Swiss-Prot record:
This is Cyclin-dependent kinase 9. It is an enzyme of class 2 (transferase). PROSITE patterns: PROTEIN_KINASE_ATP, PROTEIN_KINASE_DOM, PROTEIN_KINASE_ST. GO terms for cellular component: nucleus; P-TEFb complex. ATP binds at I25, G26, Q27, G28, T29, F30, G31, E32, V33, K48. It comes from Gallus gallus. It catalyses: L-seryl-[protein] + ATP = O-phospho-L-seryl-[protein] + ADP + H(+); L-threonyl-[protein] + ATP = O-phospho-L-threonyl-[protein] + ADP + H(+); [DNA-directed RNA polymerase] + ATP = phospho-[DNA-directed RNA polymerase] + ADP + H(+). Member of the cyclin-dependent kinase pair (CDK9/cyclin-T) complex, also called positive transcription elongation factor b (P-TEFb), which facilitates the transition from abortive to production elongation by phosphorylating the CTD (C-terminal domain) of the large subunit of RNA polymerase II (RNAP II), SUPT5H and RDBP. The CDK9/cyclin-K complex also has a kinase activity toward CTD of RNAP II and can substitute for P-TEFb in vitro. InterPro entries: CDK, Kinase-like_dom_sf, Prot_kinase_dom, Protein_kinase_ATP_BS, Ser/Thr_kinase_AS.
Length: 372
């Protein structure tokens, strides 16, 4: 059971009634998110209701951790926490008030934008998206915070074209292992389709490379418009990773055989790395292909970090990164994954390019081949 902290009454918080809810824009295991406006100023905000699973036990430690992290992080490319609000305890809510986190409102999330076929990103605009995303990661990692849930739905974009990393509900502080004692963080983090191979193999002493893998998945998605590896289970996800990034072996990933799961699981053997080959039907820019390839490296120790990624030729070659504001100004409606038609399995799932010369039956990949 998660530790809890008895802070439900939150006596120093304003009442959430100062805001008027306008629309529900998100729903998940974390609770609900609403678009709202300040009744006096008209300022638009997002209200994230803290899910009180075990109300008797007080305020969830996971929410406290998120609040503490958001109060620490102040950066243009990280979502801004304005304040914490509450509802009054009353007989109508079993004498238990609710807690809301109040954020600056962002008009879109990246999953919602990618689900809309009318939204077209130019190469310059994709460069700007990735530059802002990597800037956000560089900042949080420099402040010793791991996001641990990188995915397109957690990347917000304002109407002015400013990207904000959001949903720090799974985030945590990290440190370098001390006195040869490895860290023992949970590996049950990161949405499956964006989860890196080290977590899938059970690693608990991990760091910033887990977020960079998610960044690579998101970067590829800017062209494919759907998550590039849609596994059903952890083993299935590792199979898809092996089919795209090559077989997981000690030759490409030293000491990978230390993982108990590596010994237990039957992972595809003899798979060649084909990140660039599989993506080149969608991604025409060679620098973009190279950066995606460097982000989707199996061995976390060899995966590119945010600093080196920001210095990659992709960002310093023509066309240069360009502002998103003009493109977004042609779209009046907010776009969020929650409000969009499914873009996942089936949806706009990109198909395997026809001229690959591959026989799925012969390679026994029919069941697993959900990459493209």
């Amino acid at each position: 059971m998660a530790k809890q902290y008895d802070m439900v009454e939150c006596p120093f918080c304003d009442e959430v009634s100062k805001y008027e809810k306008l629309a529900k824009i998100g729903q998940g295991t974390f609770g609900e998110v609403f678009k709202a406006k300040h009744r006096q100023t008209g300022k638009k905000v997002a209200l994230k209701k803290v899910l009180m699973e075990n109300e008797k036990e007080g305020f969830p430690i996971t929410a406290l951790r998120e609040i503490k992290i958001l109060q620490l992080l102040k950066h243009e490319n990280v979502v801004n926490l304005i304040e914490i609000c509450r509802t009054k305890a009353s007989p109508y809510n079993r004498c238990k008030g609710s807690i809301y986190l109040v954020f600056d409102f962002c008009e879109h999330d990246l999953a919602g934008l990618l689900s809309n076929t009318h939204v077209k990103f130019t190469l310059s605009e994709i460069k700007k998206v990735m530059q802002m995303l990597l800037n956000g990661l560089y900042y949080i990692h420099r402040n010793k915070i791991l996001h641990r849930d990188m995915k397109a739905a957690n990347v917000l974009i304002t109407r002015d074209g400013v990207l904000k990393l959001a949903d720090f509900g799974l985030a945590r502080a990290f440190s370098l292992a001390k006195n040869s004692q490895p860290n023992r963080y949970t590996n049950r983090v990161v949405t499956l389709w964006y989860r890196p191979p080290e977590l899938l193999l059970g690693e608990r002493d991990y760091g910033p490379p887990i977020d960079l893998w998610g960044g690579g998945c998101i970067m590829a998605e800017m062209w494919t418009r759907s998550p590039i590896m849609q596994g059903n289970t952890e083993q299935h996800q590792l199979t898809l990773i092996s089919q795209l990034c090559g077989s997981i072996t000690p030759e490409v990933w030293p000491n990978v055989d230390k993982y108990e799961l590596y010994q237990k699981l039957e992972l595809p053997k003899g798979q060649k790395r084909k990140v660039k080959d599989r993506l080149k039907a969608y991604v025409k820019d060679p620098y973009a292909l190279d950066l995606i390839d460097k982000l989707l490296v199996l061995d976390p120790a060899q995966r590119i970090d945010s600093d080196d990624a920001l210095n990659h030729d992709f960002f310093w070659s023509d066309p240069m990164p360009s502002d998103l504001k003009n493109m977004l100004s042609t779209h009046n409606q907010s776009m969020f994954e929650y409000l969009a038609p499914p873009r996942r399995r089936g949806g706009h799932m990109p198909q395997q390019p026809a001229n690959q010369g591959r026989n799925p039956a012969a390679t026994n990949q029919t069941e697993f081949d959900r990459v493209f």
